A protein has these predicted regions:
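Short, small-residue alpha-helix embedded
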Residues: 151-162
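Conserved catalytic/binding loops enriched for acidic/polar residues
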Residues: 148
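Conserved glycine-rich phosphate/nucleotide-binding loop
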Residues: 160-200
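Amphipathic alpha-helical interface segments
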Residues: 1-130, 136-143, 157
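Phosphate-handling active-site elements
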Residues: 32-38, 132-135, 162-175
Length: 200
C-alpha cells in the first residue's frame, strides 16, 4: 500500500545492505564539481531503496570521496577527507572506519558480507592495501562472500583515483557494451555543472 512517503522507511542494523553503495559513481560524477551536492545526492540515492542510517551516511561520504578523486585528490588527501567527514557521522562504526581503522587490519579481520559497513571497510581496505587498480580489484573480489559488490564499491573509488588509463585495457575491452558505458560516462562528464534536480 502506498504511504505517500518518497523514501522507504529505515530498518537499520544488520539488515542495512550494500546495494546502494555499489552504484554511486554516476551521481558522484554528475556533481563532482560541487562536493556538498555530490554527498547530498549520493545519500539521497540510497534513501529510495536502502534507507538505514548507515547506508545513507555511507553513500553520502563515499560519493563525496569519489567526487574528490575525480577532481584530482590524492590518496593521502582522500584519507584526510574521510577522517574529517567522520566527525559528521552519527553511526560510530562508520566514523571509526572513516578514521582509517581498516588500514591497520589484516585480511582475517576484514569481512566482506552484504552488510554495508562490512562492504565499505573491505573496499577501503583493498584500496589502501594496494597501489594500482588491478591489484586492489583482485584483492577486493578474492575476499569472497559478497565479492562482486565489494569489487564494485572498490572500483568506483579506485577508478576515480587511477582514471581510465589505470584500468587494464584488456579488462575494459572485455566488458559487455564497452562503447555504451564509455559513451554514458562521457555524456555525464560533458554535463558536469549543468544537472538540475527536480523534486516532486
Amino acid at each position: 500500500e502506498a504511504t505517500g512517503e518518497p523514501y522507504r522507511q529505515a530498518v537499520g542494523g544488520m539488515s542495512a545492505g550494500n546495494g546502494s553503495l555499489m552504484c554511486l559513481a554516476p551521481v558522484a560524477m554528475a556533481f563532482c564539481d560541487d562536493p556538498d551536492a555530490a554527498a547530498q545526492f549520493s545519500a539521497d540515492s540510497s534513501r529510495t531503496t536502502h534507507p538505514a542510517v548507515e547506508c545513507v551516511e555511507a553513500c553520502g561520504v563515499y560519493g563525496r570521496l569519489i567526487a574528490a578523486a575525480i577532481e584530482g585528490a590524492s590518496r593521502t588527501e582522500l584519507y584526510v577527507l574521510a577522517a574529517d567527514l567522520a566527525e559528521q557521522m552519527t553511526n560510530p562504526d562508520l566514523a571509526t572506519i572513516l578514521r582509517g581503522s581498516y588500514r591497520v587490519k589484516g585480511r582475517d579481520e576484514i569481512s566482506s558480507s552484504g552488510y554495508v559497513l562490512h562492504s565499505l571497510e573491505a573496499a577501503l581496505w583493498a584500496f589502501a592495501s594496494t597501489d594500482d587498480f588491478l591489484e586492489g580489484a583482485l584483492l577486493a573480489v578474492n575476499l569472497g562472500d559478497d565479492a562482486d559488490t565489494v569489487g564494485a564499491i572498490y572500483g568506483q573509488l579506485a577508478g576515480a583515483l587511477y582514471g581510465r588509463s589505470g584500468i587494464p585495457e584488456n579488462w575494459r575491452d572485455r566488458l559487455h557494451d564497452t562503447g555504451m558505458i564509455e559513451d554514458l560516462a562521457a555524456g555525464i562528464a560533458d554535463r558536469v555543472g549543468t544537472f538540475e534536480v527536480v523534486v516532486g
